[in-house]
Amino acid sequence: DLEQRGLLDETLIIWGGEFGRQPVFQGKNGGRDHNPKGFTYWMAGGGVNAGTDYGETDELGHEAVVNRHHIRDLHATILHLMGLDHEKLFYHYGGLDQRLTGVVPAAPIYPLIS
């Protein structure tokens, strides 16, 4: 166990995916399509503000309506927790500074960081 061994504070644990599922049943064959407008991540350890619930979806669970962020902001947060500055970590290609968070501005989600 990471906490028992004193390693939890320096180990970042992340569970999630880059999209959720539509909150309603679709079509005669069943199933639910991808939903990039509302999804879940679970984070613990390594600098994460423990016990934090952040953001909400609408009443149907279709899309985020409170504390909305693009996935690139989550990537910037993860890089920050790993001790990396996402704005300084880039390579120049095709006339653009290519970052792990993309070419569009991103920022760490500071309420998630302890």
Regions found by a protein language model. Give the residues of each.
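Ligand-binding pockets and gating/stacking loops
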Residues: 1-114
